[in-house]
Amino acid sequence: MHFILFDDCVTKLSAAQIEYLASQLLGRLATAGADRKPHVVPTSVRFNAELGTIDVGGHHVADTKKYRDVQANGWAAIVVDDLVSVDPWTPRMLEIRGRAEAIPTGGKHLGPGFGEAFIRIHPEKINSFGVE
């Protein structure tokens, strides 16, 4: 298995990481608001090949804590993971951290599970496991 550790982080997704993201529709978004308290929620996720960003959506996103958190501090992280097999144990994981934008319009065209508002993450640190 291949590790990309935080000390050796890359800021652009590899072809294998992009392919993995395209195969997964759900991720776990982590944010923190002005109070610095963590918040993690499952959410729709998609790689934006044109911009090299991660678009995060859901229904009525503009009314959510995750959206308000991004508006408050402009940072987010997302984990996309799955378990290929339990015997042998074969997990895969992609963690992406970066600057985030709360975007009020244009999300509906991004795909299933997206409403009008969405969050866009600009990758600054990428950590992967089992995604070659």
Regions inferred by a protein language model and the residue ranges of each:
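Binding-site signature for planar aromatic cofactors or substrates
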Residues: 1-132
